[in-house]
Amino acid sequence: GEKTKKKIFLKKILDFIAKKNPKSFENNSGINIKTRMDFNRRWGLGSSAILINNLSNYYGLDPFEVSKNVTNSSGADIASTKISKPIIFSNNEKKPYYKEVHFNPPFSKNLLFVYLNKKQSSEKEVEKFKKIRIEDDEIRTISEITNQVLRCKKIDDFNDLIEKHESIISL
């Protein structure tokens, strides 16, 4: 069940940490890991990425490398754990790039987070996404949409840009 999946995932992370940093657990006859979240896990707000980031940092490893080896994540979720503000992210397969950006449009009070109670499996969704061939012109278009969103002053323009973005990336 769900508890078994969590244990397997944690073991996968710890096994990779032990492989990269063999001295990590050498003085421990056993370890006890306790985590706490300030949000409902079912919301899908990056609980796995936060765990990977925190354990990686604790053991002196690069969280992007750990994530790449234990998940099929692009690294955007790891980048999001490092900065508590909006970011832009790209991954050219060599090294993830992320940067904090200013995004506080005049209509920000009209933007909402709506929980639909439809958490998806990140692993499955990433696998599905990786099978799609994305053309270079689509990447350029998405990048331009991102830049327009960051400069956007009107909510109607914002909504149009989000719809345009979704029409490109929707599966």
Language model region names:
Residues 42-46, 73, 82:
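Short glycine/serine/threonine-biased micro-segments
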Residues 1-37, 60-72, 78-171:
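C-terminal nucleotide
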Residues 42-63:
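DPxDG-like acidic metal-binding loop motif
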